[in-house]
Amino acid sequence: MAVSLIAYGLGLFLKKKLKWAFLNPLLLSIIFVILFLQVFQIDYETYNETARYLSYLLTPATVCLAIPLYQQLKLLKENLLAVVLVIVSGVIASMGGIFVLALAFGLNHEQYVTLLPKSITTAIGIGVSEELHGITTITVAVIIVTGVLGNVIAELVFKLFRIQEPIAKGLALGTSAHAIGTSKALELGEIEGAMSSLSIAVAGILTVVGASIFANLIP
């Protein structure tokens, strides 16, 4: 567990020191841990015996994201319909995109359902993957890559498409890049963080329901 915490702390230090967008602390910590295990010839099972305790914090950490949402409750009520439509559209676009890619690359059912939960938080994504008989280890990897990518390119995309509305930024990050995207949203502002936090919960619920429907499209 200490290795994971030190690796993440080092990732944060490098991000703050160098201020490069692609130096995501989570991505760096993964690389550091892999290198550590390889150099000292430590097998994953031994490492995971202690590191798994950090996984127990995933769910309460996600629940804590409701705090900024509560602080922006009035704004949410004023834009409720637009918020719901954006999240629903984002979830459909995410799973629809996976369906199209699966057809294009000839993925089988197991590979296809493994990728369906890519845009929701790990705690929910693992459950969806298991329920649909996907490969959970790959699902976790895909979820992390999706979140890191969303975190890294978010500001570039916003500038490219001239997106300035805080609500739109928050919804986009939360719906497409789950908790890792929400960390970027919180950096951008309180409104962005609140909307992104809401998106995680709603997108997770919609994906749980919608994934079973999309899963049947490729037998």
What are these regions (language model features)?
Residues 27-39, 59-64, 85-97, 116-126, ...:
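Small-residue-rich segments of transmembrane alpha-helices in multi-pass membrane proteins
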Residues 12-20, 42-52, 70-81, 102-107, ...:
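Short juxtamembrane and helix-loop transition motifs at transmembrane-helix boundaries
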Residues 85-123, 146-161:
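Transmembrane alpha-helices that form the ion-translocation and gating core
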Residues 103, 210-219:
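Juxtamembrane boundary at the C-terminal end of a transmembrane helix
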Residues 148-153, 204-209, 213:
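Hydrophobic transmembrane alpha-helical segments of multi-pass transport and channel proteins
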Residues 111-138, 144-146, 160, 164-202:
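Alpha-helical membrane segments and immediately flanking helix-loop junctions
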Residues 1-4, 8-68, 78-82, 86, ...:
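Helical membrane-embedded segments and adjacent short helical loop/helix-boundary regions
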Residues 1-3, 73-98, 140-149, 199-204:
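Entry/N-cap segments of selected transmembrane alpha helices
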